[in-house]
Amino acid sequence: MAYPFQLGLQDATSPIMEELLHFHDHTLMIVFLISSLVLYIISLMLTTKLTHTSTMDAQEVETVWTILPAIILILIALPSLRILYMMDEINNPSLTVKTMGHQWYWSYEYTDYEDLNFDSYMIPTQELKPGELRLLEVDNRVVLPMEMTIRMLVSSEDVLHSWAVPSLGLKTDAIPGRLNQTTLMAMRPGLYYGQCSEICGSNHSFMPIVLEMVPLSYFETWSALMV
């Protein structure tokens, strides 16, 4: 999860987030090299007295500044498209969970079970226990098995919301009348925090998401108690 004065993204917990971190570093290096080149050219222009005031045509220069940006865009687009298709791919999910956005809370339904659903509200600051996080704790966590492919169906009952968990690389819009889907897989157990990432009204900041990733045996015990 995030911590105060953090530089960079949250630690990756899913394969998709690991790919996104690699792509971020790849793109950042390209941007750094372009910025360095531009600053170098600007410094040369400011420090040298050599000018070409009579130059009317420079085919070589025009060729270079047309081909070079095209190559740079290809180097960014190819890995980006690869990750995009990976995020859209859904292969035999082990569990399906439907989440609905409301003003201003989330509701969850485990569709593989007959009667396993609940609402998830933020815990007010005055009710927090020692060690709990302000504006991030909920009364009902989403318990899911780790190391398994989970399909999330996301929609909304009222206005636009967005279901996002940064450490898993997830951000899916919740749109009224439309059912979006995404997949997640956590490689290690733990608590993973997220929030609504679409401005949805006065209490937009009070719609936290808490995923509790646990071993399969623990999840089976929990689901048996909840049904």
UniProtKB/Swiss-Prot annotation:
Extract the PANTHER family matched here. CYTOCHROME C OXIDASE SUBUNIT 2, CYTOCHROME C OXIDASE, SUBUNIT II
Summarize where Cu cation A2 binds, as residue positions.
C196, E198, C200, H204
Top-rank EC class of the record's enzyme:
translocase
Which residues, renumbered to this chain, carry the PTM Phosphotyrosine? Y218
> Any transmembrane segments, and where?
15-45, 60-87
* Gene Ontology MF terms: copper ion binding; cytochrome-c oxidase activity
**In the Enzyme Commission scheme, what number(s) does this protein have?**
7.1.1.9
Cited PROSITE patterns: COX2, COX2_CUA, COX2_TM
Q: Which reaction does it catalyse?
A: 4 Fe(II)-[cytochrome c] + O2 + 8 H(+)(in) = 4 Fe(III)-[cytochrome c] + 2 H2O + 4 H(+)(out)
Membrane topology of the entry = Multi-pass membrane protein
| Keyword Mitochondrion tagged | yes
Give the record's keywords alphabetically: Copper, Electron transport, Magnesium, Membrane, Metal-binding, Mitochondrion, Mitochondrion inner membrane, Phosphoprotein, Respiratory chain, Translocase, Transmembrane, Transmembrane helix, Transport
Q: Which residues lie on this side of the membrane: Mitochondrial matrix?
A: 46-59
Q: Where in the cell is it found?
A: Mitochondrion inner membrane
Cellular component (GO) terms are: mitochondrial inner membrane; respiratory chain complex IV
Gene Ontology biological-process annotations: ATP synthesis coupled electron transport
- Subunit structure comment from the entry: Component of the cytochrome c oxidase (complex IV, CIV), a multisubunit enzyme composed of 14 subunits. The complex is composed of a catalytic core of 3 subunits MT-CO1, MT-CO2 and MT-CO3, encoded in the mitochondrial DNA, and 11 supernumerary subunits COX4I, COX5A, COX5B, COX6A, COX6B, COX6C, COX7A, COX7B, COX7C, COX8 and NDUFA4, which are encoded in the nuclear genome.
Q: What protein am I looking at?
A: Cytochrome c oxidase subunit 2
Which InterPro entries does the entry link to? CcO_II, CcO_II-like_C, CcO_II_C, Copper_CuA, Cupredoxin, Cyt_c_oxidase_su2, Cyt_c_oxidase_su2_TM_dom, Cyt_c_oxidase_su2_TM_sf
Note on cofactor: Binds a dinuclear copper A center per subunit.
Give the protein's biological function: Component of the cytochrome c oxidase, the last enzyme in the mitochondrial electron transport chain which drives oxidative phosphorylation. The respiratory chain contains 3 multisubunit complexes succinate dehydrogenase (complex II, CII), ubiquinol-cytochrome c oxidoreductase (cytochrome b-c1 complex, complex III, CIII) and cytochrome c oxidase (complex IV, CIV), that cooperate to transfer electrons derived from NADH and succinate to molecular oxygen, creating an electrochemical gradient over the inner membrane that drives transmembrane transport and the ATP synthase.
Q: Which family does it belong to?
A: Belongs to the cytochrome c oxidase subunit 2 family.
Query: Which prosthetic group or cofactor does it need?
Result: Cu cation
Mitochondrial intermembrane topological domain residue ranges: 1-14, 88-227
Specify which residues bind Cu cation A1 according to the UniProt entry for this protein: H161, C196, C200, M207
